[in-house]
UniProtKB/Swiss-Prot annotation:
The keyword Ribosomal protein applies. This is Small ribosomal subunit protein uS2. Pfam families: Ribosomal_S2. The keyword Ribonucleoprotein applies. The lineage of its organism: Bacteria, Pseudomonadati, Pseudomonadota, Alphaproteobacteria, Rhodobacterales. NCBIfam families: rpsB_bact. GO terms for molecular function: structural constituent of ribosome. Belongs to the universal ribosomal protein uS2 family. GO terms for biological process: translation. Keywords: Ribonucleoprotein, Ribosomal protein. The gene is rpsB. GO terms for cellular component: cytosolic small ribosomal subunit. Signal peptide: none annotated. HAMAP family: Ribosomal_uS2_B.
């Protein structure tokens, strides 16, 4: 059966600045085949290639979720942190947006122990932390905040993911190396200054502009939701009957 997939147009990509690469001097020759030309010293990405490649990436995201797989969204640079977290939360997936924790994939056992510690701290602090001195409580709160910042987005992952979605492969090279070691496929936005090496599903495009990042995150999140509805549909659940409560979104300042 052909499942739905979020639609997007070349025009949307242009409006979001997906075609703007980096200064020609900063280019990576490995991206040459995806470069259309240059304008005022800036490389322009060939969107006639980006469109089908982005479509292919979204299919992989959707199909992974439809089979019950887990997706890890990775983007730790400042302008990607919020959209990465929001997109992952919107489709009940997982994210790392603070700093890539070495061993997140290759040493999952140790990472899951830290997640257990975070859950334990949450519990103790939520129940009022009785019998603790002020100093002990403060230390616990500090430890909790630190763990929450680095592990909050993967606390419910429950094991290594089945697919990674990455923004800025130059910055997230450690994540790619770990995924390669474990044979976990990678979907990633690759700008003209980076190498597509190690990326299974390349999305050639700008990885700095806020609007471009927001667009990729939104599309990937919607593709994951399409996969989820396909999975539930296969299980005979009517999604129309499950109204998603929008209330909680309005609480955010």
């Amino acid at each position: 059966m052909d499942m739905a997939l979020p639609e997007f147009s070349m025009r949307q990509l242009l409006e979001a600045g997906v075609h703007y690469g980096h200064q020609t001097a900063r280019w990576n020759p490995k991206m040459a085949e995806f470069i259309y030309g240059d304008r005022n010293g800036i490389h322009i990405v060939d969107l006639t290639q980006t469109v089908p490649m982005l479509d292919q990436a979204l299919k992989v995201v959707r199909d992974t979720v439809a089979k019950g797989g887990r997706i890890l969204f990775v983007g730790t640079k400042r302008q990607a942190q919020k959209p990465i977290a929001e997109a992952a939360e919107k489709c009940a997936q997982h994210y790392m947006n603070h700093r890539w924790l070495g061993g997140t994939l290759t040493n999952w056992k140790t990472v899951s122990q830290s997640i257990q510690r975070l859950k334990q701290l949450d519990e103790v602090l939520a129940t009022g932390a009785e019998g603790l001195t002020k100093k002990e409580r403060l230390n616990m709160e500090r430890e909790q905040q630190k763990l929450q910042a680095s592990l909050g987005g993967i606390r419910e992952m429950g094991g290594t993911p089945d697919l990674l979605f990455i923004i800025d492969v130059g910055k997230e090279d450690l994540a790619i190396a770990e995924a390669q070691k474990l044979g976990i496929p990678v979907v990633a936005v690759v700008d003209t200054n980076n190498s597509p090496k190690g990326v299974d599903y390349v999305i050639p495009g700008n990885d700095d502009a806020a609007r471009a990042i927001a667009l990729y995150c939104d599309l990937v999140s919607r593709a994951a939701l399409d996969g989820m509805s396909a999975q539930m549909g296969a299980a005979g659940i009517d999604l129309g009957a499950l109204d998603v409560a929008p209330e909680e979104e309005t609480l955010e300042a």
